[in-house]
């Protein structure tokens, strides 16, 4: 960083353009590579030694970084992908085209919006290709692209607490502070039956605890991908267009549900939640027609049904009780008529 920490450091290219060689160390410091002890020469492996007698202490032209050295499984999945095959058309899409160079961070903690903006939307405008998809803007907001485009990869429902007062996601550290706990003891605080799964009633108790601290909100649900190597294996024509995969009461897409607590390093803590939580009023930003139900709406519908039956039953009961009186009244009326 002694050289590359200079924000004026640039290199002239053959086309007459300048290539920026500056590395923002504060940003690099928190990158996933630096946090894991990956040094400059681990990636730029053709730098064997530095010669400080020269103005440029290493070869001025370096080989392309080979990410497969560490990310072998991801590289194999990528080999048979539409992005790799684009190379046959003269388009090169290396790893850093999506993931960036020196400031790579964990994506687990990112929302669908953040994941798409950092990667897919760099090149793709989804509005150009999804006219067949009903409610496409809703899908774009709550379903990660790879959920459909890498259908063989695992996915899960991510629930994050959204503060309705500040209109933003409540940071995990603030949520934990409000509950007087930490990452290690969160389940001890919330999971009353100690089965390592947060039930619907336990989630609602947690929301009530937050309300006592004047924190009012809802859980924001999204379908996101497990970041496994197979998410790189995306091919043209391989997307899942079967709506019933999600919009189905027995959909496997809703089996894995987690409350997600984000960490400063971009990773997260995932806490298993029972599927019935998706029926809660407090997850009212996540609803898939025929796939999930809102329990309070069911209760309202049931109450309306009972009210309707009560009116009919009450009317029938009144008719039965007053039948003798109505019969006598009719007989008197008939006598008067004679």
Spell out what each predicted region is:
Residues 1-338:
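C-type cytochrome heme-c attachment and multiheme electron-transfer modules
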């Amino acid at each position: 960083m002694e050289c590359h920490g200079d924000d004026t450091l640039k290199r002239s290219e053959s086309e007459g353009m300048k290539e920026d060689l500056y590395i923002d160390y504060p940003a690099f410091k928190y990158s996933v590579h630096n946090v894991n002890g990956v040094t400059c020469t681990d990636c730029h492996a053709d730098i064997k030694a530095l010669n400080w007698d020269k103005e440029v202490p290493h070869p001025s032209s370096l080989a392309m970084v080979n990410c497969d050295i560490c990310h072998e499984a991801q590289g194999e999945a990528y080999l048979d992908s539409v992005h790799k095959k684009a190379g046959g058309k003269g388009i090169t899409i290396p790893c850093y085209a999506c993931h960036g160079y020196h400031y790579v961070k964990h994506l687990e903690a990112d929302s669908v919006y953040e994941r798409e903006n950092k990667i897919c939307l760099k090149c793709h405008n989804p509005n150009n290709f999804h006219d067949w998809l009903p409610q496409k803007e809703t899908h774009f907001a709550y379903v990660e692209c790879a959920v459909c485009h890498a259908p063989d990869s695992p996915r899960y429902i991510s629930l994050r607490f959204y503060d309705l007062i500040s209109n933003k996601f409540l940071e995990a550290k603030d949520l934990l502070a409000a509950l007087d706990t930490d990452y290690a003891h969160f389940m001890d605080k919330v999971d009353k039956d100690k089965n390592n799964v947060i039930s619907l009633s336990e989630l609602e108790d947690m929301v009530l605890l937050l309300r006592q601290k004047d924190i009012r909100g809802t859980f924001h649900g999204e379908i996101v991908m497990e970041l496994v190597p197979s998410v790189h294996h995306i091919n043209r024509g391989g997307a899942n267009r079967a709506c019933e995969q999600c919009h189905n009461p027995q959909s496997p897409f809703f089996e894995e549900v987690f409350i997600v607590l984000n960490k400063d390093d971009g990773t997260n803590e995932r806490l298993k939640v029972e599927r019935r939580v998706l029926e809660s009023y407090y997850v009212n930003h996540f609803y898939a027609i025929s796939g999930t139900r809102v329990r309070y709406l069911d209760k309202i519908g049931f109450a309306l049904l009972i009210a309707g039956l009560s009116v009919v039953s009450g009317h029938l009961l009144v008719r039965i009780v007053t039948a003798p009186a109505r019969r006598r009244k009719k007989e008197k009326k008939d006598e008067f008529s004679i």
